[in-house]
Regions:
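Conserved SAM-binding loop of SAM-dependent methyltransferases across substrates and taxa
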Residues: 92-106
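Short beta-strand element of Class I
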Residues: 107-112
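C-terminal substrate-binding/active-site "lid" region of AdoMet-derived donor-dependent transferases
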Residues: 182-246
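Conserved SAM/SAH-binding beta-strand->alpha-helix loop
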Residues: 114-118
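Conserved class I S-adenosyl-L-methionine
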Residues: 80-93
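A short SAM/SAH-binding and catalytic strip from SAM-dependent methyltransferases
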Residues: 160-185
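S-adenosyl-L-methionine
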Residues: 2-81, 121-168
Length: 247
């Protein structure tokens, strides 16, 4: 992948720089965050890999959405220890990168996405954190095949070999893609997520596989035993619904 994505492509690279500038222009971070690292990470990624389109992951909507998510996670959890954070459908790792720029007490972040290209790009963008005892590590994994009680993990190493299997507890699970699959409510949330697990869930309106018409419908779909945040974000003609709490 490295050879393919590092091929010269001036038009794509210029487009990526424009996308990154739009993304950075719409970040609204709280005083507890520092976005200098995400600026450098995007700059280095675009310079090193000009032949990949990042527009699906780095855009105005994601910038505003991720800022909202992070601000409220910081507000809810402050300096409480969060342990291992699982980001489902994490794409190229932008949300994870922004979370690690905060003062949240995160042990490490696992960026899960079924798209293998995302794993490569995420690990490249976060290479310093990958080398830091896997403070960040992307994996190609189906969210329906994760054990959310205690997950047993094998990851592909840089030399193409597979690591020894190890176990970890996903203490905080972030899913910003509740509207992107039709079977999330019952097959995933109800059946797979253990009680007392910390959750951050986001659904949305619009042209997605499972659109939620309003906040009330989204709330009913994902009941929690202890709700710590419930809110709505409007970006252009789309609304996002978010719940933070304990299942």
């Amino acid at each position: 992948m490295a050879n393919q994505y590092s091929e010269k492509n001036n038009a794509q690279q210029l487009g990526n720089y424009r996308q990154a500038m739009e993304f950075l222009a719409h970040i609204t971070l709280s005083k507890n965050t520092d976005n200098d690292k995400i600026v450098d990470k995007l700059k280095d990624l675009i310079y090193s890999y000009p032949n990949i389109d990042i527009s699906s992951f780095v855009n105005k909507h994601h910038s505003i959405l991720y800022s909202w998510i992070i601000q409220n996670i910081v507000r809810v959890y402050g300096q409480k220890y969060l342990g291992t954070v699982y980001i489902l459908g994490g794409g190229i790792g932008v949300l994870g990168a922004m979370l690690l720029d905060t003062k949240l007490r995160i042990e490490n972040i696992r960026n899960l996405d079924i798209n293998g290209t995302c794993k490569f790009i995420a690990d490249e963008m976060m290479k310093d954190e990958v080398l830091d005892n896997w403070k960040f590590k992307a994996t190609t994994q189906d969210l329906f095949k994760v054990n959310y009680q205690t997950n047993r993990v094998e990851v592909e190493l840089p030399d193409g070999t597979i690591s020894k299997e190890f176990s970890e507890v996903p203490a905080l699970v972030i899913n910003t893609n509740c509207s992107h699959l039709n079977n999330m409510e019952n097959d995933w949330y109800e059946k797979m997520i253990p009680k007392t697990r910390k959750m951050v869930l986001v659904g949305e309106t619009g042209n997605v596989p499972h659109s939620y018409p309003n906040q009330k419908t989204f709330n009913a779909a994902y009941p929690m035993s202890f709700e710590q945040y419930n809110g709505v974000l409007t970006v252009d003609d789309k609304q996002y619904f978010m719940k933070i709490g304990i299942k």
